[in-house]
C-alpha cells in the first residue's frame, strides 16, 4: 500500500468524483437528502462487540468510504447494513425508511446492492450471460439468479451494463477465463443492474495487481453522479482516490470521519495505517 504522504501528488490530479452521466434509471441529476443513516449500530457476538455504537450518514449521491485495518469491524458493519447479520442494537435507515429489521432480499428490492470479497459469479457462463441474469433477477422483483433464464442475452440493459463495467470487449468470454480484476469489474456491473440507489462494495481492491487497481479506480470514478456508494476498504490509497467522505474504524468504533484530505493528514490515522503496513 502506498504511504499516506505519497498520495498528495496523485490526489492533486484527481478529477471530480461521479461526473459521468448515468444512462440508467429515471434521472442522472444529483439527489438531495439522506441515502443511508446508521445510528448507534452495534453488533455483538456474545461479550465481543465487533461493531460498537457506530453512527454515520451518507447523503444521496455521495461516494463514501469506511476504512480500517484488519479486525476494525468493517466487514461486520457491511453485513449489518446488508441484513446478513442484523445489528444487536441501533437503527439503520435507507432513504428515510427504517430497514433495521428487513431481510436482505427486501433491502435489495428497495435499491440496496452489494458486492462481496468472495465471488458469486457463474463461472461456466459468459460475461454477457452473467449480466443478463442480474438484469432478469432484478426485473423479476427478486435478485434470484437461479430463477432467471440466460436466453436472449443481447438486451439493451445488458449492453449498457457491459459498457458501464468496461467489459464490452470480453462480453462473450467465460467467467472462468477472466483475470481476477475483470471478475471484480463484472461483479460491479451486476450490482449496477436495475438502477440501484446505493451500492456497498466490500474490499473490491483485495488481491488486485497494480494495473487492475488502476482499472478499478477508473470504474468507480465513472459511476453516475446521482448514485451513492459505500466502499468498505482497508486500502487507504484506493479509497482516497474515489470518495468524498471517509469514516475510519478502529477496534469496532468510529475513530474519525472527515474529507479525504482531513483523513489523509490525521495523525492517529497515519499511526494506524503506517503501523499496519506489511
Q: For each of these PLM feature ranges, what is it?
A:
Residues 2-278:
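Glycine-rich phosphate-binding loops of nucleotide-dependent enzymes
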Amino acid at each position: 500500500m502506498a504511504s499516506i504522504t505519497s498520495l498528495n501528488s496523485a490526489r492533486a490530479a484527481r478529477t471530480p468524483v461521479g461526473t459521468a452521466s448515468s444512462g440508467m434509471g429515471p434521472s442522472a441529476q444529483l439527489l438531495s437528502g439522506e441515502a443511508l443513516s446508521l445510528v448507534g449500530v452495534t453488533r455483538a457476538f456474545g461479550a465481543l462487540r465487533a461493531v460498537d455504537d457506530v453512527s454515520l450518514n451518507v447523503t444521496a449521491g455521495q461516494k463514501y468510504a469506511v476504512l480500517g485495518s484488519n479486525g476494525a469491524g468493517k466487514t461486520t458493519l457491511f453485513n449489518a447494513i446488508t441484513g446478513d447479520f442484523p445489528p444487536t442494537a441501533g437503527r439503520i435507515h435507507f432513504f428515510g425508511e427504517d430497514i433495521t429489521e428487513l431481510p436482505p432480499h427486501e433491502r435489495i428490492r428497495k435499491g440496496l446492492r452489494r458486492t462481496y470479497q468472495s465471488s458469486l459469479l457463474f463461472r461456466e457462463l459468459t460475461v454477457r450471460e452473467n449480466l443478463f441474469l442480474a438484469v432478469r433477477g432484478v426485473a423479476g422483483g427478486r435478485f434470484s439468479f437461479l430463477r432467471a433464464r440466460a436466453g436472449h442475452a443481447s438486451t439493451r440493459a445488458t449492453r449498457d451494463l457491459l459498457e458501464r463495467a468496461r467489459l464490452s470487449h470480453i462480453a462473450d468470454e467465460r467467467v472462468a477465463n477472466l483475470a481476477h480484476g475483470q471478475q471484480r469489474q463484472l461483479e460491479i456491473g451486476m450490482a449496477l443492474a436495475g438502477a440501484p440507489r446505493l451500492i456497498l462494495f466490500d474490499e473490491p481492491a483485495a488481491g488486485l495487481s497494480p494495473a487492475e487497481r488502476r482499472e478499478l479506480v477508473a470504474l468507480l470514478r465513472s459511476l453516475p453522479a446521482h448514485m451513492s456508494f459505500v466502499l468498505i476498504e482497508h486500502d487507504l490509497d484506493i479509497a482516497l482516490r474515489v470518495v468524498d467522505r471517509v469514516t475510519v474504524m478502529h477496534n469496532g468504533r468510529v475513530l474519525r470521519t472527515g474529507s479525504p484530505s482531513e483523513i489523509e493528514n490525521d495523525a492517529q490515522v497515519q499511526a494506524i495505517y503506517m503501523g499496519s503496513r506489511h
